[in-house]
Structure formats: structure tokens, C-alpha cells
Amino acid sequence: MRCVIESISYLNHDTRRVLLRTPQPISFYAGQYLEVVLADRRCPFSIASTPYDDSLIELHIRPTPNSEESDSIENVLDTASFLDINLPLGHCFMKEPPSGPLLLIAASTGITQMKSITETLQRQNFAHDIHLYWGVLKEEDIYLKDLFEEIENTSENFNFIPVVSEPNPGPSWQGEIGLVGKVALRKLLKDNIELEKLTVFVSGGPAMVYATLDMFIEHGLPKKNMHSDMFTLVPRE
């Protein structure tokens, strides 16, 4: 599908928000991703918009150092007026609202998947608790802070916890420090949240996702309750 690039803007110092206008309405589930089709490769990106925005797709694209794929995408964004895409893709998505509390754990731009899920559930008046943990390296990487804090301030059931992994983030940072999966588990146990009742979505690299899975299973989460695209894209032997 060929889409017109509606706009490109910076969300922070290095992450771009790309809006694509589709030639016809599209259908997908919150949490799915697409591929940007280039001449010599296909590059996956989670969809940040919701299924309710059926003719406008939002992507968040951040450059990755020493990556040919990333360099190719950045070059296209600097010059192109359209993108060819393939969608919908992925097995980690929200087909129906869960019947209990929801835990979302994201690393870096993995937050795009969680943004789509969160905003979709808002539209559906989801009544159970949503716990969103977002792990980044530095405070300035929390480029959707205002959005999620606004949701938290206007929703009784939404909890947003950003986590910085940089060991000494400086005096301006008063929030959580560490690895996002570990911080999430520690805080949930401290708050006496029953892990076996949670539906969990995790977005990040394979090492982060599987480490989070192992920690939560050790503390009583059924394996079937955790969902991540990494389980199918990079299955563990």
C-alpha cells in the first residue's frame, strides 16, 4: 500500500513522528505493526495510532547507531513524499479488552505499541486498572510524558510510571531508576498486585522481554498471560 507522508515532526531530540495518509480505510488491531517497504529491505515499526484512526497511521521513528536499516529509513524520511507499507502484522495485539487488570511494559520506542493499546482502551471505556511502565535511558527520552500524564490525571484507572536506566540521571529526575521490568515487578509486589490476574504486554528487545518473562513467572504470573512479538519473531530455544 502506498501512503502519502502527511507530516513529519520531532517528538524530542531524535525521535520523529511520521503521519501517513492511507489511500483507503485500513483495519488492524491495537498493538500490531507494519513494515515500511524499501527497495532492498522491509523495516518493521509498531503502529502508534488506534484502529479508530482508520485513514491516518502514526509511527515513531528513532535512528539506531550503526544500523544500515535505520540509515535507509532516515534517508527516505529526509527526501520522500510517500512510503510503501505492508500491514497489519504481528501476533501481539488487543483483539478484545482483557477481563481484568492490564500491565504494559515498554522499552524505548516500544512505547508506540502501548500508546495504541492505551488509547484504544480509553475509547472503549475500559474499567480495569492499566499499569504502564516505560523504560528509557535518559529523562529526555520520555517524549510522551505529557500525553500519559494527562491520561493519568483524567482517568481513575491509569497509572504511568516512567523508568530511567541511566545510573545517575541528575537532580531533575525524581522518578524510578533501573531496568523497567525489574522496577515494574518490584512496585507491583510492593502494592500487593496479584500477578496471576494480570494480562501483560511487553515491547522491547529479546533480552529485555525474556528477562521480564522469567522474573514474572518466578513470582507467579502464568506464562500464557504475557504477550510479546518477540515470542514469535525471536523464539527462545
Question: Which residues does each predicted region cover?
Answer:
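Small/polar loops that bind or transfer phosphate-bearing groups
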Residues: 61, 105-106, 136, 203-204
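Histidine-anchored nucleotide/phosphate-binding helix
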Residues: 111-123
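Short, glycine-rich nucleotide/cofactor-binding loops
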Residues: 102-111
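Reductase modules of NAD(P)H-dependent flavoproteins
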Residues: 137-237
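A structural signal for isolated positions on well-ordered beta-strands in alpha/beta enzyme cores
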Residues: 58, 84, 103, 129-133, ...
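A short, basic/flexible loop-to-alpha-helix module at the beginning of a structural domain
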Residues: 87-99
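Ferredoxin-reductase
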Residues: 1-81, 137-138, 164-166
